[in-house]
């Protein structure tokens, strides 16, 4: 099991943490930015972080679902660590929907995985899709949680 300090060290080894002034896609501003793509370009670090996320789960999962594009790589890594099916959502004409041909069965236990959560908007949209399919969201995992007000 990795400690929080060990997790931070693994992220730092990818040189993903930046300091300065950043305008985030949420419209907010920050003096620190974590470029998740730098973390995700390292298969070893991504796998270690996904395995740690799985170790910390205390729920049964049938399917992992992530929003495209950001959450897809980490979501797949978590699904691989769980040995579970992976699906993703994508935005079409401004609306979030399941990728063509993906299905979430009624009653499935779904773990939603995202790379970075700032406002929670994308996660809330994925949660709504899962629930509309008659499935249950059993948890949300994020590689980076900016600890702001949630919508889910």
Please give the residue ranges for each predicted region.
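Gly/Ser/Thr-rich beta-alpha loop segments that engage phosphate groups in nucleotides
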Residues: 22, 29, 72-73, 122-123
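Active-site-facing substrate-recognition patch
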Residues: 1-59
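Conserved PRPP/pyrophosphate-binding segment of the phosphoribosyltransferase/PRPP-pathway fold
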Residues: 41-101
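Short glycine- and Lys/Arg-enriched binding-loop motifs that mark or flank ligand-binding interfaces
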Residues: 16, 23, 66-67, 103, ...
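PRPP/pyrophosphate-binding module of the type I phosphoribosyltransferase fold
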Residues: 91-152
């Amino acid at each position: 099991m990795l400690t929080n300090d060990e997790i931070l060290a693994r992220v730092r080894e990818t040189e993903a943490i930046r300091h300065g002034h950043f305008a985030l896609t949420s419209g907010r501003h920050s003096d620190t930015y974590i470029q998740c793509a730098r973390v995700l370009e390292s298969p070893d670090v991504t796998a270690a972080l996904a395995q740690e996320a799985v170790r910390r789960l205390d729920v049964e999962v049938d399917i992992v679902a992530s929003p495209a594009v950001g959450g897809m790589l980490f979501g797949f890594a978590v699904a691989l660590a769980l040995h579970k099916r992976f699906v993703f959502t994508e935005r079409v004409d401004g609306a979030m929907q399941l990728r063509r041909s993906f299905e979430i069965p009624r009653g499935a236990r779904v773990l939603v995985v995202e790379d970075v959560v700032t406002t929670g908007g994308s996660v809330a949209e994925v949660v709504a899709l899962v629930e509309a399919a008659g499935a249950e969201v059993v948890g949300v995992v994020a590689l980076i949680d900016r600890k702001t007000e949630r919508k889910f």
